[in-house]
Amino acid sequence: MTISVRPAKESDAANLISHRRALMAETTFMLYEQGELDKTEEDERARIRRLAARGNSTVLVAEDGQLLVGNLTAVGGEVRRLRHSATLALGVARSHWGRGIGSQLLSAALTWSVGAGLHRLELTVHTSNLQALGLYLRYGFQVEGVRRHSLLVDGRYVDEYLMSRLQDG
């Protein structure tokens, strides 16, 4: 298995939508529930263009051959006081869990973020998602706090950790 990680292109729009919809069906760790993502290919192409045009945002994809198996989105702050930071969201297809794809995406995002001049990266993760929590801790993210009952998943309130990583510069 050779995994490649690269910035998303507009031509990835359909595959990104399919991948994100599959993630929503496979796990409750994603923000959206199954059926909630109603984006068209043009919507996704516009999102990729919009984020690529901003110096503090990006979309990365991980591919196993021609199959899109992971993605990471970094959305940078829009107002001056937040432009030094970005919020990350990462998803890997269940079929490829435990193969280091999350690590590859996060490593690529960290490299990109230094070049983009970002000082702060942040994210949230379900407190029960121990695999993802371990990944983020290994890459220098720290827990800043708990967002209590921040999500309602299958009729139950779920806590999330708010995590961040500060970079020199």
Enumerate the predicted regions with their spans.
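A short beta-loop-alpha structural element at the N-terminal edge
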Residues: 4-18
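Acetyl-CoA-dependent GNAT
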Residues: 7, 24, 29, 35-95, ...
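Amphipathic alpha-helical recognition patches that constitute DNA-binding helices
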Residues: 15, 87, 131
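Alpha-helical elements of Rossmann-like donor-binding domains used by nucleotide-donor carbohydrate transfer enzymes
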Residues: 15-18, 46, 104, 108, ...
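Conserved beta-strand segments that form the floor/walls of ligand-binding pockets within enzyme
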Residues: 61, 73, 87-91, 100, ...
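Conserved glycine-rich acetyl-CoA-binding loop
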Residues: 67, 81, 93-107, 115-116, ...
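Conserved catalytic-core motifs of GNAT/GCN5-like acyltransferases
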Residues: 82, 120-126, 137, 142-158
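Terminal substrate-recognition subdomain of acyl/acetyltransferases
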Residues: 156-169
